Curated annotation (Swiss-Prot):
Heme b binds at H87. This is Hemoglobin subunit alpha. The modification N6-succinyllysine is found at K7, K11, K16, K40. The modification Phosphoserine is found at S3, S35, S49, S102, S124, S138. The modification Phosphothreonine is found at T8, T108, T134, T137. CDD domains: Hb-alpha-like (cd08927). GO terms for molecular function: haptoglobin binding; heme binding; iron ion binding; organic acid binding; oxygen binding; oxygen carrier activity; peroxidase activity. Residues 1-141 form the Globin domain. Belongs to the globin family. Heterotetramer of two alpha chains and two beta chains. The keyword Nuclease does not apply. It comes from Lutra lutra (European river otter). O2 binds at H58.
Amino acid sequence: VLSPADKTNVKSTWDKIGGHAGEYGGEALERTFVSFPTTKTYFPHFDLSHGSAQVKAHGKKVADALTNAVAHMDDLPGALSALSDLHAYKLRVDPVNFKLLSHCLLVTLACHHPAEFTPAVHASLDKFFSAVSTVLTSKYR
């Protein structure tokens, strides 16, 4: 459960990210593919090379979904319901992949905003990404 301090940390960090969210989403997705090659199996139709426009575009979709989740932190299940359905019923993404991407998102944010990436912010973002992952995998049961 996200505390009020966690919510403040997440919103503040996301505000600082601003217009870079899509760029960071693409970078985190590429980092996921490089670090965890099995994640590539869900994207056989993508050009997965460094700097791929398809990876960047999908990374922007990820970032947009997270931006929506930040705006609706008090109702993540409602905000992410359609995305949860898509990943559970149509795409059938292995739930572990959300954790892997979350890790790569944390690394990407830490690389771009080291001064703001305090232990408290790290913990809050980790809890937030975990909450998002939990919602996205809730329909698997």
